């Protein structure tokens, strides 16, 4: 059943499903919530990537019930080390270490495999009786009094709001005429899961190299998820190598500090780019997740940034609905945009700056950044501020990210 109160979400990935579940909890069953995405019919082959879910976003997943499905498979990140070196350097001195919890017994992040997370969100959406449609939003007509949404299966839905959660190449954003500002890094992130002889003890490592960062992120068991950045051409060469040649490239970067290593799946390369939408809203339209922004993975904040959108938009919608306000009207959506766009721009600036500072061969820049890392390492109060910032717990934090229900 649909009505003028319906909220339609175009896109059934992490952000779209999380928003749907949060809205169901906050609005109850009287508001129809529809998620439309062809991928709901059959998920593609299991995503080989894993994601660092920061503490604030883990709290969101706990509130909406999705954390139970991944908790046993999630690996807490207990500490992190950062080095700055060239590929040929014999040693990699540690310039910065992070450790400790954001609250007693609460690590600042957990590593979760993407396949496990999407499965848990899908189960929660089904349990919440979200109207899941395995088809795309093909067009819509927004008016001052509502929005008419057409789906690929011929269904026409009357509603109050359409949410674009359809990824970086968002058709809904394009249909709204919302332009983006950004650029291609001419870099790719190589992703592969490795097994190793010794336990990582929950330690994440980020090695800054001239071509880009090489990150080793702990998974359950004696496994780690590697994300390493190379130029587009070099990444294509590396992923095309045979097993033995790839192992040599891997060992040269990873080292043997955890004993012998072995790739557990085929490496894949994902192109890296940056953009932010000029507006996060249109007439009866809100953009979330990759439809609104894509940033460099150097800080591991991409998905977390989208989940912050989810928490803010859900709170804005639920608060408006409880006051009897039309959730799709302009001033409601403006509140969401004011809340999220500055934080997104700030994170984009930070990741772009880090990528520039660390993905180069300048001796002067290397000296300056190493001095900076060393100073931060010797300033515990500053490190604590950075940890809380990275964990999503600083600034104007939405209720869901504080672990509170709507």
Positions of predicted regions on the chain:
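Beta1/beta-strand and adjacent pyrophosphate-binding region of the FAD-binding site
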Residues: 2-13
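Conserved N-terminal helical subregion
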Residues: 2-3, 73-175, 183-188, 243
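N-terminal Rossmann-fold NAD(P) dinucleotide-binding loop
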Residues: 16
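Glycine-rich FAD pyrophosphate-binding loop
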Residues: 24-49
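N-terminal FAD cofactor-binding segment of flavoenzymes
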Residues: 46-87
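Conserved FAD-binding catalytic core of PHBH/FMO-like flavoproteins
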Residues: 61, 148, 156, 161-267
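FAD/FMN-dependent oxidoreductases across multiple families
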Residues: 236-331
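C-terminal helical "tail/cap" subdomain of flavin- and related membrane-associated enzymes
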Residues: 315-406
């Amino acid at each position: 059943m649909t009505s003028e109160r319906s909220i339609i979400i175009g896109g059934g990935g992490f952000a779209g499903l999380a928003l749907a579940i949060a809205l169901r909890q906050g609005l109850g069953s009287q508001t129809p919530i529809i998620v439309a995405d062809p991928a709901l019919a059959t998920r593609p082959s299991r995503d080989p990537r894993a994601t660092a879910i920061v503490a604030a976003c883990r709290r969101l997943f706990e509130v909406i019930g999705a954390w139970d499905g991944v908790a046993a498979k999630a690996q807490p990140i207990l500490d992190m080390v950062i080095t700055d070196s060239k590929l040929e350097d014999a040693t990699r001195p540690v310039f910065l270490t992070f450790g400790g919890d954001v609250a007693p017994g609460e690590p600042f992040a957990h590593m979760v495999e993407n396949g496990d997370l999407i499965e848990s969100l899908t189960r929660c959406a089904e349990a919440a009786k979200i109207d899941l449609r395995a088809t795309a939003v093909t067009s819509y007509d927004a008016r001052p009094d509502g929005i008419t949404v057409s789906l690929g299966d011929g269904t026409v839905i009357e509603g109050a709001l359409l949410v674009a959660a359809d990824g970086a190449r968002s058709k809904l954003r394009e249909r709204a005429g919302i332009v983006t500002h950004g650029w291609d890094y001419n870099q790719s992130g190589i992703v592969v899961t490795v097994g190793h002889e010794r336990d990582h003890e929950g330690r994440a490592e980020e090695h800054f190299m001239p071509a880009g960062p090489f990150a080793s992120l702990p998974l359950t068991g004696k496994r780690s998820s590697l994300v390493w950045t190379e130029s587009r051409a070099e990444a294509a060469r590396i992923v095309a190598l045979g097993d033995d040649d790839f192992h040599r490239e891997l060992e040269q970067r990873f080292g043997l500090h955890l004993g012998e290593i072995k790739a557990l799946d085929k490496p894949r390369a994902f192109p890296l780019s940056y953009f932010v939408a000029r507006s996060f809203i249109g007439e009866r339209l809100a953009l979330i997740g990759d439809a609104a922004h894509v940033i460099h993975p150097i800080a591991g904040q991409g998905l977390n940034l989208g989940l912050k959108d989810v928490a803010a938009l859900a709170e804005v919608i639920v608060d408006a609905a409880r006051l009897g306000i039309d959730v799709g009207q302009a001033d409601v959506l403006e509140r969401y945009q004011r809340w999220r766009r500055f934080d997104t721009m700030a994170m984009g600036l930070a990741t772009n700056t880090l990528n520039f500072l660390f993905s180069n061969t300048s001796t002067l820049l290397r000296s300056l950044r190493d001095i900076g890392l060393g100073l931060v390492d010797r300033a515990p109060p500053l490190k604590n501020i950075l940890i809380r910032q990275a964990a999503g717990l600083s600034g104007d934090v939405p209720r869901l990210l504080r672990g509170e229900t709507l």
